[in-house]
């Protein structure tokens, strides 16, 4: 299991000359979903830590990338392969990914807390994927970012059919609307047809709103700050997204 995830993560990072531990951890979670699917519910933080360590400390497979060398720039610790000297653009790319990753990882526990509160009264289990159960109805929630959800959309569409219940991707708010507009333009119809739901948590306000899709248990609607958000997005953004062409 660990080996498969490490190998998938190594493929994702192939060609990279500099990374951070934060980026590796964030992408390890994505790869774990791809390999494990709904089984991710039963996995704790130790698996992701083991996968992360494989790439920067002690490889657990010959197919694992190994970013064995460290260099600290400012407050950020970068890793790169032995005998490879990263260039300026390599560090710039790694720093961009670091900022994206740190923002997500810092918001992760808050996102889970907000989602738990939304599903108050449901039994909850899992860390990187949460399963909420009540009266025979299941909701599976995976935590990601809207940009990563865009890249992994095929995996998320597959998950809708794999789980025995509803599948929701929980993402944090962004500083700009463009990532959401991009996803809506490209994949909103596919998501709606499949039944994929995407809800947005504001980590600062600790609120949650629907972006695409609603829960089948309409008693849950009261948990959204703005229950009409997904309907408003669907109505107004069909015109707005043409601006991206």
From Swiss-Prot:
- Kindly give the Pfam families that the UniProt entry links to this protein: DUF6834_C, DUF6846
Q: Where is the signal peptide?
A: none
Q: Which residues form a coiled coil?
A: none
Q: Highest taxon of the source?
A: Archaea
Among CDD domains, the record links this protein to: Af2093-like
Q: What is this protein called?
A: Uncharacterized protein AF_2093
């Amino acid at each position: 299991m660990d080996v498969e995830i490490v190998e998938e993560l190594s493929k994702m990072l192939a060609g990279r000359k500099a990374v951070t531990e934060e980026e590796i951890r964030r992408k390890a979670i994505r790869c774990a979903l791809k390999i494990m699917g709904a089984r991710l519910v039963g996995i704790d933080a130790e698996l992701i830590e083991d996968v992360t360590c494989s790439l920067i400390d002690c490889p657990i497979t010959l197919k694992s990338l190994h970013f064995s060398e460290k260099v600290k720039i400012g407050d950020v610790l970068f890793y790169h392969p032995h005998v490879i000297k990263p260039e300026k653009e390599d560090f710039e790319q790694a720093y961009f990914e670091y900022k994206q990753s740190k923002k997500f990882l810092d918001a992760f526990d808050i996102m889970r807390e907000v989602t738990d509160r939304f599903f108050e009264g449901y039994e909850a289990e899992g860390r990187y994927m949460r399963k909420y159960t009540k009266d025979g109805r299941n909701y599976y929630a995976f935590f990601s970012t809207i940009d990563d959800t865009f890249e992994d959309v095929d995996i998320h569409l597959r998950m809708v059919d794999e789980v025995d219940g509803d599948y929701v991707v929980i993402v944090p708010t962004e500083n700009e609307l463009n990532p959401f507009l991009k996803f809506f333009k490209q994949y909103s119809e596919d998501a709606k047809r499949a039944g994929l739901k995407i809800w947005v948590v504001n980590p600062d306000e600790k609120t949650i709103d629907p972006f695409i899709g609603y829960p089948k248990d309409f008693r849950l609607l009261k948990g959204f700050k703005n229950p009409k958000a997904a309907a408003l997005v669907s109505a107004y953004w069909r015109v707005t997204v043409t601006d991206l062409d």
